[in-house]
Amino acid sequence: MKALDQLTFDNRFARLGDAFSTQVLPEPIADPRLVIASKSAMALLDLDPAQADTPVFAELFSGHKLWEGADPRAMVYSGHQFGSYNPRLGDGRGLLLAEVVNDAGEHWDLHLKGAGQTPYSRMGDGRAVLRSSIREFLASEALHALGIATSRALCVIGSSTPVWRETRESAAMLTRLAQSHVRFGHFEYFYYTKQPEQQRVLIDHVLEQHYPECREAEQPYLAMFRTIVERNAELIAHWQAYGFCHGVMNTDNMSILGITFDFGPYAFLDDFDANFICNHSDDRGRYSYANQVPIAHWNLSALAQALTTVIEVEPLKEALGLFLPLYQAHYLDLMRRRLGLTTAEDDDMALVERLLQRMQSGGVDYNLFFRRLGDQPVAEALKGVRDDFIDLAGFDAWGADYLARCEREAGNGDGRRERMHAVNPLYVLRNYLAQKAIEAAEAGDYSEVRRLHQVLSTPFEEQAGMQAYAERPPAWGKHLEISCSS
């Protein structure tokens, strides 16, 4: 394992030139102190976890010091926000500090969020608050532990620097890791500003660095777009299967890698509600849980439009047409696993849909239901969850069909509990848990955010003394809507 001064850098995106980013030095925050660090994220850089406890760690990730090989850059991009095109966005408070090459030859972006003003700050102060930084850290690491593709969070550094949002808060910096920070909005920027040469440079960069398997295809650009469609179909299937709501699916928040990116007012479902809106600013429900599938397709079509400079329209349409069937296949596979099914039958989607209808009408806790369904043999498990439902006759009818479905599988009961517990988390990141950790951290106590992170790092395994993190939320904690303010 390495010390901080032993990292190797290869800043490929910075070398693309000033048309793609602007060199900006981070503005340090006062009195930097470590709030939390992820040992598993540090391992991606081959960093010794003990480095997090050194003074230089907080200094490097708060803007006070800079590596000799770093080349901090604010990236330029545009994007569709709530369906309307915004011609010039860019990193308004984040900097791509450097690209680290680990011993396996993997490149990881070090991105500092809350690093101060940039040419793209759009009248903002360039800061991130402790509250939103903790939320992104927890979500990144929780989704990773669930097996959902996501950017990673290395650390959060707190400070005494004041910032004003709805009230006075303290500034913080989050260091995010991803193998690329290129967004759909990067391609839109060069398309709508009519810069075809720069557009092609960017496309070639992404193809070469992130989709090398597509280079030998008959149409490499089309093969790359098709793979992006495939990755997003799988990603959104995981979101829907595990009840994750992103909240701000603007095209500038969509990663070209098909990973969860730019966490804001996100939430996991508590009681199942297909129409749940987690973003307080989304008064029309554009980014509701139910709309995430069509919005992902819409965003991919926006990316496709930006790629019409290098790919014919009809092949792009054909590739876009793959999204929904691929999504449905991935989603159904995940839901079969969550139900403990090991084979496929034609009526399985109808079985899932009928269950969700019963859950919606009864206000049943989404993730907890699946966990409890795997606690016992099928017949006993159905009795155990029955009282959660209001329409008992409707649930009994569904339960009879589910029991019959399980009985048609040879050996379904063998290892059922272990099989279902391996895919149905006991612990999920509920907003009220995050809020309690944030309030403690704002008072200077970081123990709760660290404890919550530890619990969420192994969400499928029961942990001694952590029952409180596996319970239904209190009435005040259900379906919290979160502001975009960060």
UniProtKB/Swiss-Prot annotation:
It comes from the Bacteria. It catalyses: L-seryl-[protein] + ATP = 3-O-(5'-adenylyl)-L-seryl-[protein] + diphosphate; L-threonyl-[protein] + ATP = 3-O-(5'-adenylyl)-L-threonyl-[protein] + diphosphate; L-tyrosyl-[protein] + ATP = O-(5'-adenylyl)-L-tyrosyl-[protein] + diphosphate; L-histidyl-[protein] + UTP = N(tele)-(5'-uridylyl)-L-histidyl-[protein] + diphosphate. ATP binds at residues 90, 92-93, 113, 125-126, 176, 183, 262. GO terms for molecular function: AMPylase activity; ATP binding; magnesium ion binding. Keywords: ATP-binding, Magnesium, Manganese, Metal-binding, Nucleotide-binding, Nucleotidyltransferase, Transferase. Nucleotidyltransferase involved in the post-translational modification of proteins. It can catalyze the addition of adenosine monophosphate (AMP) or uridine monophosphate (UMP) to a protein, resulting in modifications known as AMPylation and UMPylation. This is Protein nucleotidyltransferase YdiU.
